[in-house]
Regions:
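C-terminal functional module detector
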Residues: 1-241
């Protein structure tokens, strides 16, 4: 829905000259406990007493005593019913769909409140689903020399627009982009980096196209589709590794 909002914003701007969906991105927990769980292995709850145990989240079988208490209390806020799985009772609840939080990542000059809030205001931020990946993105013109620089990031700040800011049209010259991504060493490797282009026709009709700009294992994007073939990496559904 974020990408849909961006496209709607472009359509509204084409029609009304204003874009109410010109926002940056951060990740967060949305918990109601005052505490955060940013790892699935350490996830304890989202709303406290209602889902504060594995049993209440449908992750572990309930005892007969707990089932009796829930049925007597008419706790339909928690329980939609019970499921019999291999002879054991599990709570059937929407809380099974909740999990560890995302993270807000901010490119700030210093680790101070002032610098961090300045980065929020200029939207030089990004969101992750919990892994501590790092992503930088710059756009500009004539950026070919950036790869020859001793400090490409410093050069990009001086000669390009940062993520979240506006990149103005330069006559008919096509913009160039610098993307830098670093995996979380404690999580799975990165499969690919994508740039998603959104634009509108003069009528305001929106369009979207996805480009794979970097892929793992030496894979190259197809010249027609702009996408790489799927990697051979698989996920073990028994342990999610």
């Amino acid at each position: 829905y974020v990408r849909e909002a961006y496209l709607r914003g472009l359509s509204l701007e084409a029609e009304y000259k204003i874009n109410p969906y010109k926002f940056g991105l951060v990740g967060a927990s949305d918990t109601h406990t005052g505490a955060i769980s940013d790892k699935e292995s350490d996830y304890h709850s989202k709303i406290g007493i209602l889902d504060g145990t594995p049993e209440l989240r449908g992750a572990a079988p309930v005892t007969q005593s707990l089932r009796d208490q829930l049925e007597e209390a008419g706790a339909n806020v928690i329980v939609d019913g019970f499921l019999d799985i291999e002879g054991k009772d599990y709570i059937d609840t929407g809380y099974t769909e909740w999990g560890a939080s995302g993270l807000a990542a901010v490119w700030a000059e210093n680790n101070t409140r002032e610098s961090i809030y300045d980065a929020f205001r200029r939207k030089e931020t990004f969101a992750t689903s919990g892994s501590r990946i790092k992503v930088r993105f710059f756009g500009g013109y004539g950026l070919d020399a950036i790869l020859d620089q001793e400090d490409p990031v410093k050069y990009a700040y001086a000669n390009a627009s940062t993520m979240g800011s506006d990149l103005l049209q330069n006559n008919n010259e096509a913009p160039e982009f610098m993307v830098w991504a670093l995996r979380d060493v404690k999580r799975a490797p990165l499969d690919r980096v994508q740039i998603i282009k959104g634009w509108t026709e003069l009528s305001g009709k929106p369009h979207e196209k996805i480009y794979d700009v970097a892929c793992s294992d030496g894979r190259k994007a197809d010249s027609k589709t702009g996408l790489c073939k799927d990697s051979r990496a698989k996920v073990n559904l028994n342990n999610c590794k």
